[in-house]
């Protein structure tokens, strides 16, 4: 006789949807139980968890975080399809990075700088080569013109609750 609530969880891959939905109510093996899911370490099929509180009964559907699978109507997520459509129209596609293009003159050099990034380098290019650099979290600069830093000293103003800021602070230890 408790009211029934359907909850659908959507989000990007590895952003904690399964953990958030039930605090680990199901073991990983129960959620990602298809061979392909285990091999790739991703959720392809929707996972379902039911639980109750003193006031309500919940049926929670965790949708896969991969755009290739979310829209597939055969996954049994029709109960949240309208929500997905509404979210898709409101939230743009996540950024994939920026592709930098341009002309490097003969003998010009450039550096890609970023924090903790794996950078693959191209030793040389020839006239007529079409080159582009995917620079997500990186900057392309003239060699030696800037240096990356891991520590900075800054003065920070934190918005109060009344100004729209957080009312509980977070730091690296909490």
From Swiss-Prot:
Q: One cellular component GO annotation, for this chain's record? A: mitochondrion
Q: Which gene encodes it?
A: TUFM
Instruction: Indicate where this protein resides in the cell.
Output: Mitochondrion
Query: Which PANTHER family does the record associate with it?
Result: ELONGATION FACTOR TU, MITOCHONDRIAL, ELONGATION FACTOR TU-RELATED
UniProt binding sites for GTP: 62-66
- Provide the alphabetized UniProt keywords: Acetylation, Elongation factor, GTP-binding, Hydrolase, Magnesium, Metal-binding, Mitochondrion, Nucleotide-binding, Phosphoprotein, Protein biosynthesis
- Quick check: keyword Hydrolase in the entry? yes
Q: Which residues cross the membrane?
A: none
**Entry superkingdom:** Eukaryota
Q: Which family does it belong to?
A: Belongs to the GTP-binding elongation factor family. EF-Tu/EF-1A subfamily.
Relate the protein's function as given in its record. GTP hydrolase that promotes the GTP-dependent binding of aminoacyl-tRNA to the A-site of ribosomes during protein biosynthesis.
Q: Which residues carry this modification: N6-succinyllysine?
A: 78
- Gene3D superfamilies from the xrefs? P-loop containing nucleotide triphosphate hydrolases, Translation factors
Name of the protein this chain belongs to:
Elongation factor Tu, mitochondrial
Biological processes annotated in GO: mitochondrial translational elongation
Q: What is its EC number?
A: 3.6.5.3
The catalytic activity, as recorded, is:
GTP + H2O = GDP + phosphate + H(+)
In alphabetical order, the GO MF annotations are: GTP binding; GTPase activity; magnesium ion binding; translation elongation factor activity
Q: Give the modified residues of type Phosphothreonine.
A: 103
From which residue to which does any coiled coil extend? none
Location of Phosphoserine modifications:
121
Which Pfam families does the record associate with it? GTP_EFTU
In the record, N6-acetyllysine modifications are located at 161
Which source organism does the UniProt entry give? Mesocricetus auratus (Golden hamster)
Taxonomic lineage of the native organism: Eukaryota, Metazoa, Chordata, Craniata, Vertebrata
